Amino acid sequence: MLDQKLIRENPTFVENNLSLRGKFYDIHSIHKITVERKEIDIKISSLQSESKKLSKIIGQEIRNPNNANSQELNKLKEQGNKYRIKVSEFEEKKRILDQQIRDEILKLPNFPSKDAPFGENESNNIQIKEWGDPLKKDNLKTHWEIGENLKLFDSIKSTKIAKSRFITLSGNGARLERALINFMLDVHSNNGYLELMPPALVNSESLQGSGQLPKFSNESFKCANDDLWLSPTAEVPLTAFHKNEIIDPKLLPLKYVAYSPCFRREAGSYGRDTKGLIRLHQFNKVELYWFSDPNKSLEAHKEITADAESILKKLNLPYRLVDICTGDLGFSSSRTFDLEVWLPSNKCYREISSCSNCRDFQARRSSIRTKIDKKTSYIHTLNGSGLAIGRTMAAILENGQRPDGSVKIPDVLVPYFGSSLIKTN
């Protein structure tokens, strides 16, 4: 959430910063409400001051036995009552304006970092580096063709169970998924992350805190009878884990890793990636999350990205690192580095992790603070997939495919999977 004081005092600055995202945000309309709210505050303070003075006068009059029932005293009491009624009316107006301001500010995205490349869309993203040797051959099978041939998953039966864009993993497919989850959790835990296993259901306040609500309400699954939603990413419960807390600066950075199922409607993706593991309503993901000292989040961003990269390197999967431009940034992000894994059947890279520095944006929405130089400040939060399991499996199947139809399992995964190959029966 953006700073309300900044919007009130410098709306043009806020508008200009948000315009870097390639979209106009009418900050001056919000500014008018904040000014009106400030004026009401002044009126309330003035009335309370007058009421306080009047109370002293009434007290003096009451102590005077000659004035205990005087007409003048009754007039003073009546005036005091009018002050209280007026203050109450202004307080109610202020409450309504506060809610209006909060509702409008919650719709505003984060400021892009001054270090993020300027651009309108993904075509303006900048490749930082490539790693590995991408497999470039003709007539390679897609991961869903490989999966069907090896009986790793079934989408037809899943449609009977639920609907399209769901998958049932079976046999070696389920085993590979479990192996990847355990491998990733072990790597990150050994790298200083504390493993959490949060609820798969989250309340509206948690979604609001991480930035999914109100903007992305149509992209999430909501329970009919409760204020609960299926979590779209572990980023949501991990942000809420320290909601309304002041964290001891000596504990920073706090580094968490969590495996969780994720649920998304994929409302804007009709017709895209309809087969395979790339875009599903339900998928598994290992999430990395940092609570950082505000003065150290730039370095933390490099570290969390490197931690996600390490999984791809250990699995020997070719990838590239991309700096996301201002117009393609996620709602809560100030700066994002994407990791994109090579899918040889498509002859292109596909996103497998977004590592974002949200600075104090989520912390303001969730009221998460720390002490810096004896002053209370909002903490900085960072998140990144470490990694998305389904997309990692897709990359392993495609990059590890062999002419005989089998798939080579990455060496580091063999102890978890129990075999170096997935073969046809």
Curated annotation (Swiss-Prot):
Keywords, comma-separated and alphabetical: Aminoacyl-tRNA synthetase, ATP-binding, Cytoplasm, Ligase, Nucleotide-binding, Protein biosynthesis
Residues reported in the UniProt entry to bind ATP: R264, R265, E266, E351, I352, S353, S354
Domain of life from the UniProt record: Bacteria
Compartment(s) of residence: Cytoplasm
Alphabetical list of Gene3D superfamilies matching this protein: Bira Bifunctional Protein, Domain 2 (3.30.930.10), Serine-tRNA synthetase, tRNA binding domain (1.10.287.40)
Molecular function GO terms recorded: ATP binding; serine-tRNA ligase activity
GO cellular component: cytoplasm
Major localisation: cytoplasm
Pfam families: Seryl_tRNA_N, tRNA-synt_2b
InterPro entries tied to this protein: aa-tRNA-synt_IIb, aa-tRNA-synth_II, aa-tRNA-synth_II/BPL/LPL, Ser-tRNA-ligase_type_1, Ser-tRNA-synth_1_N, SerRS_1_N_sf, SerRS_core, tRNA-bd_arm
GO biological process: selenocysteine biosynthetic process; seryl-tRNA aminoacylation
PROSITE patterns: AA_TRNA_LIGASE_II (PS50862)
Self-association state and partner proteins as the record states: Homodimer. The tRNA molecule binds across the dimer.
HAMAP family: Ser_tRNA_synth_type1
Domain notes: Consists of two distinct domains, a catalytic core and a N-terminal extension that is involved in tRNA binding.
Annotated NCBIfam families: serS
Function: Catalyzes the attachment of serine to tRNA(Ser). Is also able to aminoacylate tRNA(Sec) with serine, to form the misacylated tRNA L-seryl-tRNA(Sec), which will be further converted into selenocysteinyl-tRNA(Sec).
Protein name according to UniProt: Serine--tRNA ligase
Organism: Prochlorococcus marinus (strain MIT 9515)
Lineage: Bacteria, Bacillati, Cyanobacteriota, Cyanophyceae, Synechococcales
